[in-house]
Amino acid sequence: MKIAILATNPHLYSHKRLKAEAEAAGHEVKIINPLYCYMNVAASNPKVHYRGGAPLPHFDAVIPRIGASITYYGTAVLRHMETMGMYTLNESIAISRSRDKFRSLQLLARKGIPMPLTSFAQSPDDTEDLIHMVGGAPLVIKLLEGTQGKGVILADSHQSAVSIINAFKEMHANILVQEFIEESRGTDIRCFVIGEKVVAAVKRQAKDGEFRANVHQGGKAVKVKLSPQERAIAVSAAKTMGLRVAGVDLIRSNHGPLVLEINSSPGLEGIEKATNINLAGKIIEYIEKKAKPISSNHRFHG
């Protein structure tokens, strides 16, 4: 098979691992920077050209590893590849859906998937009511555009919540205000979903004095055993987004597991090293089983 990895940085652990496993399985692999791609829009012969002017060849499968900062352009390139009949591991519409944090929460709520109580605002006039909607302090305030734990603040008191929200109000920032689950302070669980199965899971523990468990914020990851309920919720969350491969972040509360976030380009390094599971290899095996050209009547989803 000819496989493209759509990514801006070929040196990241995840991208090197995917390339190595695909090549070890006998496939031809190219890492394609989406920012170097440009496209024509044509009814009969859509094309993607690459830096230097050469048209991209047809790939049997595309693995999108699109960073959050280039979601719009990266998914546009991916969508064009879909119109050309290329199989994409995660489809452009699913990535866009999961990157819109509030939209993803709306979809999860519609499916009855449990999550923390959340409100959404942009420069709210009534800060007090916004706080009241999620049950009061302590609460978590998140910038809608934040990733890897950045732009996430814990307000321990009512006054600090008011001050933080009012500060964001001055920036005209889109924010999520979310109830804080005290019993999960400093921990979360990353479930790695491929297809309709959780293939690996780790518990992430924040460093001392930090409530964000993200490995990028200095947290540590250790292998964890999931309950059947946690597995089912993680798979349902990924399926709701339409993602074939996803990192689903859960927390354990006194009333059961809650979904925090769904990542369409989950990192491999922390979870592979903590579990000794070859996730890159499992992704390539999944592609080998599932990759088929997209039929003409399924090439564009809007």
From Swiss-Prot:
Keywords: ATP-binding, Ligase, Magnesium, Manganese, Metal-binding, Nucleotide-binding, Protein biosynthesis. Its cofactor is Mg(2+); Mn(2+). Mg(2+) 1 binds at D249, E261. Mn(2+) 2 binds at E261, N263. The keyword Ribonucleoprotein does not apply. One of its GO terms (biological process) is translation. GO terms for cellular component: cytoplasm. Binds 2 magnesium or manganese ions per subunit. Its EC number is 6.3.2.-. One of its GO terms (molecular function) is metal ion binding. Residues 105-288 form the ATP-grasp domain. ATP binds at K142, E179, F180, D188, R212, A213, N214. Mg(2+) 2 binds at E261, N263. Coiled coil: none annotated. It holds the Pfam family RimK. InterPro entries: ATP-grasp, ATP-grasp_RimK-type, ATP_grasp_subdomain_1, RimK, Rimk_N, Rp_bS6_RimK/Lys_biosynth_LsyX. The keyword Ligase applies. Mn(2+) 1 binds at D249, E261. Gene3D superfamilies: 3.40.50.20, ATP-grasp fold, A domain, ATP-grasp fold, B domain. Belongs to the RimK family. This is Probable alpha-L-glutamate ligase. It comes from Legionella pneumophila subsp. pneumophila (strain Philadelphia 1 / ATCC 33152 / DSM 7513). The lineage of its organism: Bacteria, Pseudomonadati, Pseudomonadota, Gammaproteobacteria, Legionellales. The gene is rimK.
